[in-house]
């Protein structure tokens, strides 16, 4: 299944998810500026039964690699990135289901007072697949 989110500046991305080996969730993201493909990312998610949370690894076509965990909080999925040493990164994404065909993603950054503040909010809608780049 794939979802597309667009921003006012013409940037968009298409995120597609499916199962892998009947046990993992595999995600791919294609980033666009207008119709031009500008980057790609892959990720794999698995459930850590001991910690009772989802862990993930992600990598990007520009060479970036990231790790983190996801938890369910008040009906939202909170994706918390981790720094290379394992500490919590000052940024996270919070996903909330809007309806059967869309979800809202708030990219947040920790403020000086310790609270989380939205930096960008994008609503993703279901699409058939990512367009060719």
Where are the regions that the model predicts?
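Hydrophobic small-molecule pocket/channel-lining residues, especially in calycin-type beta-barrels
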Residues: 1-133
């Amino acid at each position: 299944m794939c979802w597309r989110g667009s921003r006012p500046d013409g940037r968009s991305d298409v995120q597609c998810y499916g199962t892998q080996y009947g046990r993992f969730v595999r995600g791919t993201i294609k980033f666009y500026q207008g119709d031009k493909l500008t980057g790609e990312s892959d990720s794999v998610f698995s459930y850590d039964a001991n910690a009772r949370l989802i862990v993930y690894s992600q990598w990007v076509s520009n060479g970036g690699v990231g790790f983190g965990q996801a938890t369910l909080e008040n009906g939202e999925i909170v994706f918390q990135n981790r720094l290379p040493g394992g500490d919590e990164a000052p940024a996270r994404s919070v996903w909330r289901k809007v309806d059967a065909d869309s979800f809202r993603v708030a990219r947040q950054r920790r403020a000086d007072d310790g609270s989380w503040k939205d930096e960008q909010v994008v609503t993703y809608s279901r699409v058939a697949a990512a367009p060719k780049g």
